[in-house]
């Protein structure tokens, strides 16, 4: 399963120069980006990242990462100071989900595959341990057959054992297991409990808490120290001060105090002091007036929360640790104008792995050695775009017809001016998700072809607080669609776009919004493009029902889609309304999609062809709810270009 990677070494050698950036200097990226003649080949935008999810070993001596070699995803491990002799581990048909270290010589690898349970194809995961000195791979916890298998709660500093939360099957809640990495022995450290999906351990390896949800109320099962029984701390229902959702917990070992991330107080996720003994939420450690915090960063040794992560127009971190705050400032001085994220660090914080990039920069990984006062490039994930000038992306706001302020991302094509340009509006998938200020190949491809691209954060998008999400409940095809249309109207009023040259495009929920926009508002759009779009909302609800572990969870999801008034979903579904379509559409889907079944697209294409509608379609046999084959994505991009050239030319 492992071999020495000569080809890999050559590739890394090309990517990893001897260039070093002194932190005292104000140098930017490793190389300036010259202007590039357009159009850039579709293949450059279809490139999958060469390297992803890199992580430093605890001693800072090695880097493990996911790499794409010869069209196959593999795990690579190489010395941080000598990247020319990597180890390469074959993955076969497994997907890499997560990479971690257990000590300096062992990599923990969570991999995913699909298994069939009761005629349902369900993604499951497995946890592997890779011993670097012997190049051996061991499957841990052979009984685990759930979606969750690699939630590592605690790793022994010496790398000898770990605590992991895992399911025995996809429908049960996880238990916590102690795994001896030398022998592979597995012991139950904490039995599974009803409705407890999240477990937490402290820096001493003690399972301190689990969070359960039932009947719109959270319960924290908590113990003060090892040997104590778990006791229940129940949250309040309704609109009480401490109702809401708990996202995360952290502890101070041997103490009843800790940190809780919850939206209980303001409807936005924020970090608060928490007394586990009394179940009392205390003063805020950090809350943002506009957006949720997304996660907390924990010191790898002490387990103390060192930073708070949040995302407004771009990803940011507020360091609570003064040392890390100073380190971040030095990094941003050396690599200005980008999102500079510390993705991994050695236990002594001397070496840090940094990702630096943004919406118009596919990014570069750097290794920062503090003692040497040096930042050196490790790899550029997208090698074909290394010298390509990409279009700028701005965070904007506009007002919906009912007065709601909506954030969005606006991309303007280079060298085209800013008046009466063609537009592609691109609502995101989810729909309970959000866009971010990161490189998006579809956005940049469209901009490279001369199109303005608007990515609206319609109501229901996450990250902007509970109230904003709930405004989207029951609004599929209604107010959520209004928000997309209102974004087009706003841009038209600015004069930036030509109202007669607008197309709508998206994937998953975004694909639904594209098809529904074409049916509902043909006067606004010249064409629509859908990848893996939902065409029958009621059918997708019934399809999703099989993956819920209890009827009440399905009912909650059903309410989010159909609303409290349970509208007739056929009235907002493209398939039942196919006869109303009058503009050209392009429909695409991966045949291995288990999120939106391909039959939704096939049925829509058949219905439109029977009515002699202007429909083009393509189905990719080896792809799922996204592209895993660059050649397929390149083909799709070329089809998009040809389709737009015919129906919405730039």
Q: Where would I find each of the regions flagged by the language model?
A:
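Beta-propeller folds
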Residues: 18, 28-352, 359-361, 368-371
């Amino acid at each position: 399963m492992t071999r020495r990677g000569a080809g890999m070494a050559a590739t890394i050698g090309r990517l990893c120069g001897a260039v070093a950036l002194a932190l005292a200097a104000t140098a930017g990226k490793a190389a300036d980006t010259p202007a590039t003649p357009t159009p850039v080949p579709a293949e450059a935008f279809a490139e999958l990242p060469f390297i992803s999810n890199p992580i430093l070993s605890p001693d800072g001596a090695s880097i493990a990462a996911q790499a794409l070699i010869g069209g196959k995803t593999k795990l690579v491990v190489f010395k941080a100071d000598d990247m020319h002799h990597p180890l390469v581990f074959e993955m076969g048909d497994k997907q890499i989900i997560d990479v971690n270290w257990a000590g300096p010589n062992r990599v923990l690898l969570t991999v995913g595959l699909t298994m069939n349970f009761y005629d349902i194809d369900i993604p499951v995961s497995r946890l592997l341990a890779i011993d670097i000195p012997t190049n051996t791979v061991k499957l841990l916890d052979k009984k685990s057959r759930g979606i969750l298998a690699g939630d590592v709660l605690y790793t022994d500093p010496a790398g000898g054992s770990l605590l992991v939360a895992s399911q025995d099957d996809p429908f049960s809640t996880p238990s916590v297991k102690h795994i001896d990495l030398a022998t592979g022995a597995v012991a139950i450290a904490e039995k599974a409990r009803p409705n407890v999906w999240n477990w937490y351990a402290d820096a001493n390896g003690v399972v301190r808490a689990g969070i359960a949800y039932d009947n719109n109320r959270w319960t924290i099962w908590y113990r003060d120290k090892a040997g104590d029984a778990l006791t229940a701390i129940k949250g309040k229902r309704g609109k009480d001060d401490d109702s809401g959702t708990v996202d995360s917990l952290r502890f101070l070992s041997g103490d009843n105090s800790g940190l809780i991330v919850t939206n209980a107080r303001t409807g936005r996720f924020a970090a608060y002091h928490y007394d586990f003994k009394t179940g009392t939420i205390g003063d805020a450690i950090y809350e943002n007036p506009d957006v949720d915090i997304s996660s907390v960063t924990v010191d790898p040794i002490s387990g103390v929360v060192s930073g708070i992560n949040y995302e407004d127009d771009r990803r940011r971190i507020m360091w609570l640790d003064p040392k890390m705050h100073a380190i971040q400032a030095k990094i941003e001085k050396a690599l200005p104008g980008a999102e500079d994220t510390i993705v991994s660090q050695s236990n002594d914080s001397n070496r840090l792995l940094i990702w630096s990039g943004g919406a118009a920069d596919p990014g570069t990984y750097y290794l920062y050695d503090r003692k040497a006062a040096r930042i050196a490039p490790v790899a550029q994930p997208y090698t074909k775009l290394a010298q390509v000038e990409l279009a700028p992306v701005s965070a904007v706001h506009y007002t919906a017809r009912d007065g709601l302020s909506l954030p969005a991302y606006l991309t303007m094509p280079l060298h085209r001016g800013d008046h009466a340009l063609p537009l592609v509006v691109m609502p995101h998938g989810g729909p309970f998700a959000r866009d971010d200020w990161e490189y998006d190949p579809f956005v940049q491809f469209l901009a490279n072809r001369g199109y303005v691209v608007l990515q609206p954060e319609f109501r229901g998008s996450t990250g902007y607080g509970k109230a904003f999400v709930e405004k989207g409940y029951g609004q599929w095809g209604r107010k959520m669609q209004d928000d997309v249309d209102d974004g087009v109207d706003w841009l038209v009023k600015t004069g930036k776009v030509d109202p007669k040259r607008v197309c709508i495009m998206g994937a998953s929920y975004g694909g639904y919004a594209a098809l529904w926009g074409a049916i509902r508002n043909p006067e606004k759009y010249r064409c629509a493009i859908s990848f893996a779009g939902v065409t029958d909302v009621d059918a997708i609800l019934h399809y999703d029902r099989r993956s819920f572990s209890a009827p009440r969870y399905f009912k909650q999801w059903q309410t989010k889609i159909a609303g409290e008034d349970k509208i007739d979903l056929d009235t907002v579904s493209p398939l039942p309304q196919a006869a109303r379509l009058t503009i050209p559409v392009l429909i695409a889907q991966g045949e291995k999609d288990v999120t939106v079944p391909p039959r939704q697209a096939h049925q829509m294409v058949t219905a439109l062809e029977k009515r002699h509608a202007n429909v083009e379609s393509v189905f990719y046999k080896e792809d799922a709810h996204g592209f895993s084959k660059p050649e397929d994505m390149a083909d799709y991009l070329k089809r998009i270009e040809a389709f737009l050239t015919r129906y919405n030319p730039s």
